[in-house]
Each structure stands twice: as C-alpha cells, then as structure tokens.
Curated annotation (Swiss-Prot):
Keywords: ATP-binding, Cytoplasm, Ligase, Nucleotide-binding, tRNA processing. The gene is tilS. Its EC number is 6.3.4.19. GO terms for cellular component: cytoplasm. SUPFAM superfamilies: Adenine nucleotide alpha hydrolases-like, MesJ substrate recognition domain-like, PheT/TilS domain. It catalyses: cytidine(34) in tRNA(Ile2) + L-lysine + ATP = lysidine(34) in tRNA(Ile2) + AMP + diphosphate + H(+). Belongs to the tRNA(Ile)-lysidine synthase family. CDD domains: TilS_N. This is tRNA(Ile)-lysidine synthase.
Amino acid sequence: MLVAAAVAPRQRLCVAFSGGADSTTLLHLLARLRPRFGFDLCAAHVHHALSPNADAWLDFCARQCAALDVAFHPFREQVARDHPAGLEAAAREVRHAALSRVTCDWLVFGHHQDDQAETLLFRLLRGAGVRGAAAMAAIEPGFPGRLRPLLGVRRADIRAFAQAASLEWIEDESNADPRHARNFLRHHVFPLFGEAFPGAVPALARASGHFREADGLLGDLAALDYAACGGSPWLRDRLLMLSDERVRNLLRWRIRQMGCEAPARARLVEAVRQLRATHAPLYLPLGTAACCTYRDRLWLEPQRDGAPEQPLPWRQEPALCWGAGVVRFEPVTGAGIGRGALQRAMDVALVPRWPGLMLRQDSGRPLRSFKNLCQEAGIPAWLRPRLPVLRVDGEAAWIGEIGVAAEFRCGPGEAGLLLVWQR
C-alpha cells in the first residue's frame, strides 16, 4: 500500500496510536519498513480523560515510541459527556480534531477488515446512502492523506501476529461495553453472523468497496451534469430538465465540493420540489449550504451570517469584516471613492441598508431607490438585507454589488479607494 500511495522518502507518516493491538502492530510494522522506504515516522496519542487508566496508557505509548525511536505527540483533551450524538461520537470528534493538528503528509490508521464490516453495518442501520455505505478507503489522498494498511486484514490475524512477535499492547475496557452501538454489533451481532455466514465479514467489506465504486460513478455523473448545466451559476431551466434523482445527486456533489456537509435526502427532495414548483427567487437552506435562484440562474453557496446590526466605523483600516465576509478598501488612482472626501468626513461607517435609502449612480441622473437599484443589478430579494452600505456623514457613498454614488466618485488622477465586498 505504501507503494500504491506513492509514499516518498522524507515524507512524514503519523500513526494514530491508541496503544491497542491494532495500532501497536501497525507502528511496529512501519518502524521495520522505515529504512526501506525512507519516510519519517511519528505517532500521536489522544488522552481522552475518560478512563482511570488514561494516564497509564499515555505512558505506555510514550515508552513504545521511545523503544522504536519514533517521535511521540501526546494530546490531552476533554470530551463533552453531554454530546447530543453520544459519548462515542464526542470522543471521535475530539480525536479527529487533535490528529488534524499534527504536521504530516499521511495519517496512518490501524483499521482492519472487521472494522470495515462493522462500519458498513452500523451506517446501513442508520439509513446511510451510497457515500456512507462506502465506509473507509484504504488510501485517501489529501493534506494530510489517510492510509489504512490493515484494512484487508482480519482482527484475529492481527492479534495472532502481535502475539507471535511478542508485542505488548493495552486493552481499553470501554471496548467491552455493549451500551456503545459498535461494541454491541461487535460482541453480539457479528458472532451470530459468523455462525450462520462464515464469510460475512469479508463479504461486507467487499460490499463497501462496491459502494465506493458506485459513489465514484455518481460523482462522475454529477461532474458531467455540472458542465452541461453551464457551470456555476447553473442555467435553471437546463438543470430542471434532469430527473429529480440527478438534480439531487448534483446538489449533493456540489455541496460536498464546497466543503459543506450534505443534507438529508428528505431536505433535498423538498428543495427539488420547490425548485420545480415556482420560478420566483428562492433561498433554500440545505444544512450548512443554501440553494439560491434568481431569474434564470441557480447556484449554491455556504450559509452565511446576516449583516451586522450595529454600524462598523471605518478608521482607515484596509478591511472591515462584514457578516461572514469582508469589505476591502484598496488604494487606486482615478477610480472608486475619492479618498479626500472620506478624509474630510466626520462619520464614515459600514452599515446595513436603511428605510428610504437612495443613491445617484451618475451625475445628472435622479436619485434611485435601493429596491430599484437592486432590481437593475439583478440582486435577489433575500440577498439585499446583507448588502454593506458605506455611509459618509449620513449619505450613502457606496453599496455592495451596486457601486459608488456619483457625488463621491473619484476624479481622474485623484487618489481613490476601491471597495470590494468578498462574500
């Protein structure tokens, strides 16, 4: 697997080291392979403070690493016992957060074939889709990437190897607690499976591989549909020519590409229903993302905070935060807002729109209402309350997505400031 992952000399591998049989075996194997491949090896241990033995486990892991000449990174963390998803989920989140702080090229885990089968069954019982049923990948490229070299090996075989090699490891007493869902499957369900279906674990692990292939194909289909619909923003009518299933697949794929969590299927079903039901502008929350439509366009964006309620005074800063975005004040010549006008003003601040807001875009033309300006600029109604307005001594000098008022526009050759709203 190290060859398949193209692990190169001097790359940094970090083992997620609990001290149990699986991660102990993995650490010893990698320590043996280190001279051959030339990678740097370290280990990270997360002290969850959940067991009275946690301090002893940390000391054990430190001694193991010292004996193997492996750099050791301990993390002492606190786990919320009132986590809504349960103690297991809380500990897992804390563990992943700690491991994310390790500087390395690859995080290496001791997950094995039994873990893969348990993960698949656990997720299916929770109603997982194709992505969830794909369970764990042996190689996940990234920064850092993730490797699971033992994913095709049975738990019993790892134990047998560890015993034959006279390795020492710890036993976490919580792994025997049937109140944890995965432990219940491990100790009560899978033994019954094994009696009736001796090949159940390898078969379930193979099935997860089939789901992973299917998930990849769905991603390929979504990429084709993404391009066929005009990219982002999409052409709304072209998107809605697709079947409901393909629209949901495309939305789910794009949301994940944005780094957001994909919403439940029911939420996507309702979103597609609303998209087909009306041509009116829409803002449809989809978990941490939102589906937006205006006129003939449709796009996705992360859900963002609204505009600040209080004015944000500007005191010559190069940028001011605005909701989840930022307004930048970039020095230019002959464009943007005249710098002199701002320096002479008594009160300069970013504010949200206010009732009766008017702005004149060109000299000799009448003042126009905020609503009319937004309509002409193609700004949907749901976005308008979030637009930043630069107020200068009580007057609107600039509105995000619309532009500068004629009275404040910089003249040719004059020092100006170009305001850029980054959402």
